Amino acid sequence: MRAAVAELGAVQIDAVNVLVRAHYLTLFSRLGPYPVRLLDELTGRRRQAFEYWGHAASILPMQFHPLLRWRMARAAEDKSWAGFRARVEGQRPGYLAAVEREVAERGPLAFTDLADPARRERPARYAASTMLWDRGSDGKTALEYLFDAGRLAADGRKGFQRRYDLVERVIPPEVLALPTPSPDDAQRALVLHAARALGVATANEIRYYFYLSAAVAKDRLRELVESGDLLPARVEGWDEPAYLHPGARRGQVSARALLSPFDSLLFERDRVERLFGFRHSFELYVKPAQRRYGYFVLPFLLGDSLVARVDLKADRATRTLLVLGAFGEPALPGSAPAELAAELRDLATWLELDSIEVADRGDLSPALRSAVDDRP
């Protein structure tokens, strides 16, 4: 588990739970069925990983903490937080310090645990929405600011609410004692890790892995090429120049995996299409009538090809894995339905679901249903 997180560098977290949370699913794709407590323990009592902003909210190897201190320092003074700081200190003098003090005395705390979460009345335009309810709290926003600025750290979650505690109670002392690299050095290390994780990639794909700006990525890539830590590369059929990590090796892939929409393999959709000829369609935030494939669609990797996609949902009330749609790619191999059925069985077992139900939607559904019913 620790090695898998270290190799990926960033395991994205997301609130969507129609099947299982994204970070658990990303590790299932690589490790197969595993006790989810192992990932929780990695960021919990074992203190071998931590949560911060990598590629969006992410689980990161603990050794990355020094590499992200520049991001924390910038967040502390970032203009995007200036309005909130000015308003809350104007309306509630000392509130930020009081929140930090309460966490020190009573942490770890979620925002709902605060003695005064300082809820705000929502603007009328959001009256019918539940999406922004939590942001109607100065307490929640204060905790998020202190987290972004590196003054608090995440200590697990309560439901899906982040719990906050003092940095020194979350990050091991030996990690806090590590020297803080310059922003340039830290960014070079992040770029190098992204390049190693991707194998061969364009500048945009590398920068997107840890959400670096285009200008920063351009400078760090140039420096790494000049030092010989990265190699410039040309890939047949690619319009843009690429970069290759010297340690990259051509490997033989014999994978069989369902991929979370938030998997690092799918971070950059143009890259997915260039590598696999597969247009990843991310439709979570598309209106239902406009969706082509479904709400929570997982590409299916077989060997070194993305050969199908399935729209999945875990019906926990009936303990059923619902395949709401199944769609094959043009070059679908004949073995794909049986291989996909086997992967769905592994997924259902891991999620403690008793049965699999395949709906009619999608060209692959009849063959997949037959394969699911034809248990070995």
Descriptions of predicted regions:
Residues 1-376:
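Long, charged, low-complexity, helical-prone intrinsically disordered regions
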